[in-house]
Amino acid sequence: MLNNEYKNSSMKIFSLKGNEPLAQEVADHVGIELGKCSVKRFSDGEIQINIEESIRGCDVFIVQPTSYPVNLHLMELLIMIDACKRASAANINIVVPYYGYARQDRKARSREPITAKLVANLIETAGANRMIALDLHAPQIQGFFDIPIDHLMGVPILAQHFENDPDINPEECVVVSPDHGGVTRARKLADILKTPIAIIDKRRPKPNVAEVMNIVGDIEGRTAIIIDDIIDTAGTITLAAQALKDKGAKEVYACCTHPVLSGPAKERIENSAIKQLIVTNSIQLEENRKPNNTKELSVAGLIAKAIIRVYERESVSVLFD
């Protein structure tokens, strides 16, 4: 717990159904109780939200990742924003540890939508004044919004784990990006750990032929740490782990901020060359979706510090610069 000075302040932290344990942990760090609200569903699936205390003139923070089920959690968030606006909240800040639809951030083919932008429009139209986000899949999503975005980074939390793990010697490690798009993220982790980086270059020679993984960098005899922002079905990450082992990596660890872990992910990871999977609790991970070799780190402290700085009108950049 950081302090108790906000117990009787105008700060209110609310949780919806997306990740209640994380929201409770954030409130505990800040030193206040979660705001009282109820989230119910009618028999036809419609959502009903009732704020059970006055928030007039308050700075409201709504903690809600738009993770699985994405559409349900997104609608909960939009309805809660509207409820806060109609209840005369002074500022409506949304805390979105995982931003669903972020992977639809551009038109990959003709006649496709840019759903990440649509979601931004919906959030703004509903009435949010600010968003605190964590490791957006594409940083340029910040530009989809006209409201302020505080973009927090999960890399320092992951790095701290590897620095403190007695089984890992950073001097013998190499940080691996599973694709070209993740090089910046891998470089940040490598800079903290003071290790070299490697990149996996995936190429498909022709249609219906398996991808060939070429590894750019020296990994032989080293402990490889694969880092990504999202692990979904775990196909790419497990193939990458095997390719690293085949090329002489001593051990392979994998880490990510957002453990979506859908479909066959659990089985794939447990049966892969990955020694341990390190994730954060940005998404509430049910036990039946969590691989046995998973280590979960908390982002609650980071989010709590961001909330306090926003409430105090202080710079948030010190948390990620």
Swiss-Prot record:
The EC designation for this entry is 2.7.6.1
Q: Which reaction(s) does the protein catalyse, per the Swiss-Prot or TrEMBL entry? A: D-ribose 5-phosphate + ATP = 5-phospho-alpha-D-ribose 1-diphosphate + AMP + H(+)
Q: Which GO terms describe its cellular component?
A: cytoplasm; ribose phosphate diphosphokinase complex
Q: Which domain of life is it from?
A: Bacteria
An example molecular function term from Gene Ontology annotations: kinase activity
Residues annotated as binding ATP are 44-46, 103-104
The cofactor named in the record is: Mg(2+)
Cross-referenced InterPro entries? PRib_PP_synth_CS, Pribosyltran_N, PRibTrfase_dom, PRTase-like, Rib-P_diPkinase, Rib-P_diPkinase_bac
Q: Pfam families from the entry? A: Pribosyl_synth (PF14572), Pribosyltran_N (PF13793)
Which residues are D-ribose 5-phosphate-binding?
204, 228, 232-236
Q: Where in the cell is it found?
A: Cytoplasm
Oligomeric form and interacting partners: Homohexamer.
Relate the protein's function as given in its record: Involved in the biosynthesis of the central metabolite phospho-alpha-D-ribosyl-1-pyrophosphate (PRPP) via the transfer of pyrophosphoryl group from ATP to 1-hydroxyl of ribose-5-phosphate (Rib-5-P).
Q: Which family does it belong to?
A: Belongs to the ribose-phosphate pyrophosphokinase family. Class I subfamily.
Protein name as it appears in the record = Ribose-phosphate pyrophosphokinase
Gene this chain is encoded by:
prs
